C-alpha cells in the first residue's frame, strides 16, 4: 500500500500539463503573443471631376455649333444671291449679283473662313469636355474664337454699310437706292447680314465663356 501511494505521489507534473490545466481554467498564457490590430482608414479622398467646368465645356460645344450654322447660312445665302429684272432693252439687261460688290465678296470669304476655323476647333472643344481642367486647349479655343469673331464682325459691318446705301442711297454723293428696283436681292442680302451678326454674337459668348474657364484653370494650375 505504501509503495503504491509513493508511486502516485512521485509522478512528475510536466510543464505542458500545467499549461493545459491553466488553459482549462480560463487563465491567459504569458508566453502567448497578443493579436495584431489592423487600422483601416475610412477617409475618402475626393477626386476632381470638373464640376461646372465640364458644363461650361458642353455649353461651349453647343455655342460653337450655333456659330458654325449661322456663318454657313450667311455665306450660303449671300453666295447664291442674284436677281434679274423682268424687263430689258436691246442693249441692257438689268441683272445684279453678289459678286458685283467687293464688300459682298469679302463677306462670303470671311464667313467661309470663320466656318473652317470653327469646324477645326470642334475636336479641341471635345477635349475640354473630356478633360475639364486642361488649360492648353482652352487657350487655343480663345485665340481661334477671337480671330473668327474679328473676321465675321468686319465682314458683317462692311456688308451692312453697303446694304444701308442700297436701301437709302446718298443724296450728297448722288447715289440712288437700288433696292426700289432690286427688292428681292436687297431682302436676301439683309437676311445674310443678320445671320452673320448672329454668328458674331455666338462667338462673343464663346470668348467670354472660354476666358472665364481659362482664368479659373490658370488660377488652379499656377495660382495666378
UniProtKB/Swiss-Prot annotation:
One Pfam entry name: CASP_dom
Family: Belongs to the Casparian strip membrane proteins (CASP) family.
Residues in compartment: Cytoplasmic: 1-57, 127-138, 213-224
Membrane side Extracellular: residue ranges: 79-105, 160-191
Membrane topology classification: Multi-pass membrane protein
Membrane-spanning residues: 58-78, 106-126, 139-159, 192-212
Subcellular location: Cell membrane
Protein name: Casparian strip membrane protein 3
Main localization (coarse): membrane
Quaternary structure annotation from Swiss-Prot or TrEMBL: Homodimer and heterodimers.
General function of this protein: Regulates membrane-cell wall junctions and localized cell wall deposition. Required for establishment of the Casparian strip membrane domain (CSD) and the subsequent formation of Casparian strips, a cell wall modification of the root endodermis that determines an apoplastic barrier between the intraorganismal apoplasm and the extraorganismal apoplasm and prevents lateral diffusion.
NCBIfam families associated with the record: A_tha_TIGR01569
Residues of this chain annotated as glycosylated in UniProt: 168
Region spans: Disordered: 1-30
GO biological process: cell wall organization
Organism in which the protein naturally occurs: Vigna unguiculata
Keywords: Cell membrane, Cell wall biogenesis/degradation, Glycoprotein, Membrane, Transmembrane, Transmembrane helix
Entry GO CC: plasma membrane
Amino acid at each position: 500500500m505504501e509503495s503504491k501511494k509513493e508511486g502516485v505521489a512521485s509522478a512528475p507534473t510536466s510543464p505542458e500539463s500545467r499549461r493545459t490545466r491553466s488553459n482549462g481554467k480560463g487563465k491567459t498564457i504569458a508566453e502567448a503573443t497578443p493579436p495584431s490590430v489592423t487600422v483601416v482608414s475610412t477617409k475618402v479622398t475626393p477626386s476632381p471631376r470638373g464640376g461646372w467646368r465640364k458644363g461650361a465645356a458642353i455649353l461651349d460645344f453647343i455655342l460653337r455649333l450655333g456659330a458654325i450654322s449661322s456663318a454657313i447660312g450667311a455665306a450660303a445665302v449671300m453666295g447664291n444671291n442674284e436677281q434679274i429684272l423682268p424687263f430689258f432693252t436691246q442693249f441692257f439687261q438689268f441683272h445684279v449679283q453678289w459678286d458685283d460688290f467687293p464688300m459682298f465678296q469679302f463677306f462670303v470669304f470671311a464667313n467661309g473662313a470663320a466656318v473652317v476655323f470653327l469646324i477645326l476647333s470642334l475636336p479641341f472643344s471635345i477635349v475640354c469636355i473630356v478633360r475639364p481642367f486642361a488649360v492648353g486647349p482652352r487657350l487655343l479655343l480663345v485665340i481661334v474664337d477671337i480671330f473668327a469673331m474679328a473676321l465675321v464682325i468686319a465682314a458683317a459691318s462692311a456688308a451692312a454699310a453697303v446694304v444701308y446705301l442700297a436701301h437709302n442711297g446718298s443724296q450728297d454723293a448722288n447715289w440712288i437706292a437700288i433696292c426700289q428696283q432690286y427688292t428681292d436681292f436687297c431682302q436676301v442680302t439683309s437676311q445674310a447680314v443678320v445671320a452673320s451678326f448672329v454668328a458674331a454674337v455666338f462667338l462673343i459668348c464663346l470668348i467670354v465663356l472660354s476666358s472665364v474657364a481659362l482664368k479659373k484653370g490658370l488660377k488652379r494650375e499656377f495660382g495666378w
